[in-house]
Amino acid sequence: MAERFFHTLERAGPTERSRMDYTNKIFNMDCLSGMSMYPDKSIDLILCDLPYGITGCRWDSLLPFDELWKQYLRIIKDNGAIVLTSCQPFTTKLISSQPKLFRYCWYWYKNMVTGFANAKKQPLRCVEEVCVFYKHPPTYNPQGIIVLDKPVKRRGKSVPTHGDSVYRIDGSLAHDTETCVVHYPRQVLEIKCERGLHPTQKPVALFEYIIRTYTNPGEIVLDSCMGSGTTAVACINSGRNYTGFEWDKQHFQTAVERVKSLLPTP
């Protein structure tokens, strides 16, 4: 069991990179140094809850975007997605750090709110963004869809038009369509929070949803800031491989123990 987890990783040259065994391993080291030793285009999905830099805590220090994107863009496959959780004001900084590759956001609607100290001045906060970046259209497996036995027709609706419009000049949608698939996902994900083993731990269900959406079974997901190992747990539950880094020894050990508890006893 112990061979899955390493406290250090020796530096590797270009030749050694291709032979590195990093699948289903969490490394206790700085992620920027660690990612530099991964092969080019070796990762199917990058999923990470980066430090937001909004709490002043030691573990919440911002990573340098230039160095982070240099490694992310080198190791992600051409059809891979980079999915990063965030909340304002960090979201604006994150999107501005790579505007050409930013595509859209999901919105995690939380059942637990924050911001009570400022409740008389601003609304309580119950949403975090999940920002999606990619070079080329990635794997996309929409979750929760229903496939019908027979196609249904969706008629284009006539609407008033004036000035610029996304509709045709005659005021109608482009055309009627037939489909066998309904209930495509919307941007808002209502998933309950988890009281976890890390101050900012995300729900396993949220990460499972993202992993199943942007990867296929057997592919590999990298989390550069593993925390308590939620990404690894979600990968195991989803039939995907994981790899990643956590520099804090206590959180690293928590992640290791969490993953071990899910693996069959030899």
Language-model-detected regions and their locations in the chain:
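Short, conserved SAM-binding/catalytic segment
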Residues: 21, 256-266
